[in-house]
């Protein structure tokens, strides 16, 4: 699931992941609908601009892109926190792969 701003970035990330990881089901939602979308879809992974308490409590793998406009991104992968100074597409794809491994 992608729920980050700006919208073009959110949709671009979703499109690229869909092309490069066709087995992954991707939902793009507005950031303000993140919590209700987590309840509705029960995603294995979320990419967002702000990690909410609901996200942290219900999703095992998530990426918070540049929180509070900070120069880094934060990921949680099965309870392990990782920071990326300049997260790249390959990093996101690797996290998608790890989310799939954890889901199986």
Q: Could you tell me what each predicted segment is?
A:
Residues 1, 42-47, 59-64:
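Hydrophobic beta-strand segments of well-ordered beta-sheets in folded domains
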Residues 1-31:
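Short, charged N-terminal beta->alpha structural module
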Residues 10, 34-35, 54-55:
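Short, well-ordered alpha-helical microsegments
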Residues 14-17, 56-63:
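Short, glycine/charged-enriched secondary-structure capping and boundary segments
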Residues 29-45:
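Acidic, metal-coordinating helix/loop segments flanking the phosphotransfer/catalytic sites
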Residues 31-33, 48-53, 67-70:
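Short, polar loop motifs at secondary-structure junctions
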Residues 38-40, 52-60, 72-75:
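Short loop/helix-cap segments at secondary-structure boundaries that form the rim of catalytic
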Residues 61-104:
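Ser/Thr/Gly-rich flexible loops in soluble cytosolic domains mediating phosphotransfer, phosphorylation
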